[in-house]
Amino acid sequence: MKRAIHALDAMLAGLTLAMGQDSPALVSFLFHALFQDERERNSDLLDPQQGITVKMFRRLVEYFLGKGYAFVSPEDLLRGVASSGRYILLTFDDGYYTNVRSIPVLEEFSVPAVFFLSTDHIQYQKSFWWDAVFRELKNRGKTLEEIVHVNAGYKRLKTTDVELCLRKEFGQAALNPVSDVDRPFTAAELKDFAAHPLVSLGNHTKDHAILTNYSDSEIQEQIHGCQDAVREMTGKSPQMIAYPNGNESPEIRKVVRDCGLQFGVLTRPGKNRLPIEAGSSEAMTLKRFTLWGDREVDAQCRISRSTMSFYRFFKDVEVQTDARLSSSRHS
């Protein structure tokens, strides 16, 4: 079903772009780990998630530059961008060491990117829990569908509780990284990485906390703690947060603003209308597209430029329905 919707979107994008409907907007893309090639992507050392290789990432940058888009950083957005422009914001979540592979591409085309950091993983050199789940269950012969189902259950818990479950089920070493592919940056590596002029840093909470699972005081600790840790390790203060798993609320956004952050990004696809005023409701809920390694890069780029999308329409309906259900449960 999803593939059929994407096929329809590809046709719709071709029609709308042929009619000149490539409106001014901020278009953002979400990445996680960067794989050197397909062999590494299929190594089962970690959850491949979107399965993006360096070659695919490079092609996306090349594509949008060829279409006249300008690449921006959070600092550019804070200074303000022209409402008549078309912009790309490249974002990487979590703090995987393999994000260093983006640097040659960023340098080749002189484009910036923002990297959202889960600081406890860096400071304590822990595997991300979903990678541990993927490794352990793959080794036990579980299918991808079964692993996704297990992860959905864990996403209802706090990170510390998930990690406790994994250590109990798979042993104390379950959250130890097994290679350079699945591990986070070290603090020393991050300091060097952060010094690059094309690198901006973002807040991703202390331990990739899905914030809607936490109390008000815990939310503050997660966001403020990450902000403090990034400053301590790099001397930089993030201007932007990526809400882990995309989960946020008006109460969470207030904490984000109180912490001095000016922008927040979701995992929900869509174009962001201009202008974007720092600290506004729109600035705190910027949408991001996800690039997938099993689909043609150019086709996905065209879909993201289009003003119309069946997939985005259905996702918006799903989000609105979930919000109404959540509101009714808490009323």
Predicted features by range, described:
Residues 29-35, 85-88, 109-247, 285-286:
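Metal-dependent polysaccharide deacetylase catalytic core of the NodB/CE4 family, i.e.
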Residues 96-97, 207:
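Short, glycine/acidic-enriched loop or turn micro-motifs at the edges of active sites
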Residues 1-91, 97-99, 128, 134, ...:
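C-terminal active-site subregion of NodB/CE4 polysaccharide deacetylases
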